[in-house]
């Protein structure tokens, strides 16, 4: 599968305002501004190796306007370009027992000079063991090995245990999480960095 997405601002005209705050803005439809907000080009390949093993490989290139998308001061982080490699392998050990392994690597660079040092390159490894239909156990480590500040080349290790019953899901975990955009089910939010236990309960009706 090949997917391409791109998001630019729209050119437009600012109307007059009593406060001169440029709130009154009329966009020009189908007239894209030069400033790029986000771009994603990715290729996904799914391969069934045998009856018990299947794999997914992804190559992606993204351009991310961090200042605009995260509401930060312009020039603080700049425009970030990243190339991403993902390998995901799932193996069925026996009936009801499955292990999944995922490896990711992100190579990034700032396209424009910024006030803050670049976070640079990342690697991520994950092992997930599932006992159907209820239990799953996960170990994940993210390592920011390419940060320009060597003191911030940190590991973000997380351990999670979850239990599912019908339409209910319970999960408890412990680990270190980095600040950033966190997305679940197509809904994204900015979360602060944290270190400790977390408990989540979700139900569908």
Where is each model-derived feature located?
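Exposed, low-structure sequence patches enriched in small/polar residues
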Residues: 1-205
